[in-house]
Amino acid sequence: MTSYAKLSLFSPAKINLFLHITGKRADGYHNLQTVFRLLDWGDTLEFLVTQDSFDPTAPINEQHLLVRLSSTVAITAQVMDNLVIKAAVALLQAWQNSALTRSSDPAVTPHLPVIEVTLNKVLPTGAGLGGGSSNAATTLIALNKLWGFHYDIEALIKIGATVGADVPIFVLGQDAIAEGIGERLTPIKLPQHQYLLLNPAAHAATQALFAHPDLQRNVPALSIDEIKAAQSCYLQQLNAPFSNVFEPVVTKLVPEVNQALNYLRQLEALTGTQARMTGTGSSVFLPIPTDKISLITHHLSNAGAPCDYVLTQSLDKNGQNPE
């Protein structure tokens, strides 16, 4: 067991500075290349050890209560589909599948406490900001401590990849180049930046986007060294060979995203930077130089924006890495 009784952890958003599909895999998934950037804007999760307990060796099913989840927004109708619950189940399954861990770890007791989880939701869903994946990663990190499993970050990343393709970056907790389906991560040092994010209240289904005939699926893969050396092409600008291959498809299918992106493009003359979409949408963002923040703030206060927006900055710390 552990001495932790309660944890409160930040669950950040991410943006994709670019997003390429480099080919289709034998398993039906697509290989991607992207640079993930974590933001100082996100949800908060509170984890409380309760007096209730469960047998961690028992089979896991819907009646196997590992955590009690409450949220400031509506939770998935089928609770087992919630990524917080999926993360808890994946962590326990990994422990159950490791006889070595069970036999050699004196910190693990015959019974583990049920954890009460409160999700204070800020991030919009279906926005390409990774909110659900971030919540799942934060849950893995918290329960790893509270249940005394002592998995290292590499192990948690592997477990996270079974929950969702974007979960590993949030377990890593820092900006990174991602390859594969998002699970192969190479940390990258990027300068601090501010961003204006617009969050339209509409989005296209990810499955439909991957199936769309106009989606570019064969962008030539770049080496890690090439991506690191070309930061000036995707940090404040988005120049060839970098792009978000989903952006032209989403802007055709979702007028609200196109409207938000056009709004940001009108500000490019003020900022000298380039707007783009994150992930598969629907959020779009514009890098804002420090000396332009007051100008953009003044513009927003006078002219407003076509949808919800937030001014934020890149996360300047290592995030949620486990101890």
From Swiss-Prot:
Coiled coil: none annotated. It catalyses: 4-CDP-2-C-methyl-D-erythritol + ATP = 4-CDP-2-C-methyl-D-erythritol 2-phosphate + ADP + H(+). It is an enzyme of class 2 (transferase). InterPro entries: GHMP_kinase_C_dom, GHMP_kinase_C_sf, GHMP_kinase_N_dom, IspE, Ribosomal_Su5_D2-typ_SF, Ribsml_uS5_D2-typ_fold_subgr. Keywords: ATP-binding, Isoprene biosynthesis, Kinase, Nucleotide-binding, Transferase. One of its GO terms (biological process) is isopentenyl diphosphate biosynthetic process, methylerythritol 4-phosphate pathway. The active site is at K14, D166. Its EC number is 2.7.1.148. It holds the Pfam family GHMP_kinases_N. Signal peptide: none annotated. GO terms for molecular function: 4-(cytidine 5'-diphospho)-2-C-methyl-D-erythritol kinase activity; ATP binding. ATP binds at P124, T125, G126, A127, G128, L129, G130, G131, G132, S133, S134. Pathway: Isoprenoid biosynthesis; isopentenyl diphosphate biosynthesis via DXP pathway; isopentenyl diphosphate from 1-deoxy-D-xylulose 5-phosphate: step 3/6. Belongs to the GHMP kinase family. IspE subfamily. Catalyzes the phosphorylation of the position 2 hydroxy group of 4-diphosphocytidyl-2C-methyl-D-erythritol. This is 4-diphosphocytidyl-2-C-methyl-D-erythritol kinase. It comes from Psychrobacter sp. (strain PRwf-1).
